[in-house]
Amino acid sequence: MIKILRNINNNIVNRYDGLNKSYLNINFYCSTTNNSSGKIDYTKLIPENGNISKSITEKIGKNLHCKRDHPLNIIKKKIQYHFQNKLSDEEHKFQFFDSFEPKVSVKENFDELLFPVDHVGRSPNDTYYFSKDQLLRTHTSAHQSQLLREQEKAFLVTGDVYRRDTIDAVHYPVFHQMEGVKVFKDKVNLAIDGKPFDETIDYYEDNNYKQLQSVKDVEKDLKQSLESMIRSVIGQDLQVRWIDAYFPFTSPSFEMEIYFQGQWLEVLGCGVVHPSIMNNCGLSNDRAWAFGIGLERLAMILFNIPDIRLFWTEDNRFHNQFKGVDKSISTSSSSSSSSSSSSSSTLSDIDIKGVQFQQFSKYPSCFKDVSFWLEDEENFHENKFYEFVRESCGDLVERVDLVDNFTNKKLNKTSHCYRIYYRSMDRNLTNEEIDILQFNLREKLENHLSVKLR
């Protein structure tokens, strides 16, 4: 398997080099940056009617991870198979949840996961809000506390998640994650170190807590489980290393990196569930681990898929390449609520050896520039511009780059110049089509953002 993967075009791997953490940490936010002038109340920045655009609304309910023969479904089943057949035991039989609704509360998505009130992830520049109280989940961890309260001991949650982001071959405002959690009852920790939950302890910084035998045991089980899982998907000879990290809802926290195509790539975030979360879920004497992994990322690496937009295409030239890879008998593997799961269905492993995407689109890209002055620089955010471009031009935009940024001291104004690359995945775009798209974008730009065209 590893030998086959080594033949993958290095350009696929290089696309990930230097990407921002909002994508690399596919399930766990990393930023702890606070506004230097004090804490930001992001609820005051949320538009009264939300900030969810039509193009995002149209993606809700597509559930690509549940569509048989879709590469995301194949990756999901590969991981589920390993947890069901290799990592389940009498006490921990992993349950699968694939159909939780993406509309969740701010409490579920942020508060219960200990996100600080001024965490950048709460910003409407990063998150899609229906209102100040409800949003489109930014990670499948939004369902963690609910399932813990319902006494689920071992589970995987897969779903679509939503984040406002840049435009390029590996970023898309909708992508898919898998969250995994395993709970260890009190006999694993209290009997060992006799340390119940203590609200006075800073569990992020307290080294005595991190050195408890129960915490070390859970950490060991976490790393062993995830190493066996990733090797079952990518290859048994895979090199893996662990990097210390920070996430609001785990402590200690880690990132897994794999050595692939000559460089180390971060593939998932994980850690021991924060004791405060366990306490709030009525499990103060228990410990648990959790991880989050992005399905698109694995699929792009494994199947040599060069552009994240392809996962959303309806072109049969894409889908026919994965048809029949899953040879298992078709059974429903999704649950619409936490009261049911797919654990009763026995999964079969899927052989993905030699499955490589063959590009059918060789159409060249064409770029157009747009320059403007920022009329309200303090409230301008690049994600607002990217969102506007997506809404105006759809998936015909391959990527957008900021190519010039300067301040005119006499005018006391800042100018941005963005280069917009147009490219269809399934046909050749004419110059006339591109000119119309660019003209319409310029026509609407000043009315939608506080800018002045140059």
Swiss-Prot record:
GO terms for molecular function: ATP binding; phenylalanine-tRNA ligase activity; tRNA binding. SMART domains: FDX-ACB. Belongs to the class-II aminoacyl-tRNA synthetase family. Signal peptide: none annotated. It is found in: Mitochondrion matrix. Residues 327-347 are annotated as: Disordered. The lineage of its organism: Eukaryota, Amoebozoa, Evosea, Eumycetozoa, Dictyostelia. This is Phenylalanine--tRNA ligase, mitochondrial. Residues 361-454 form the FDX-ACB domain. Residues 328-347 have a biased composition (Low complexity). Substrate binds at residues 141-144, 163, 170-172, 177-179, 266, 291.
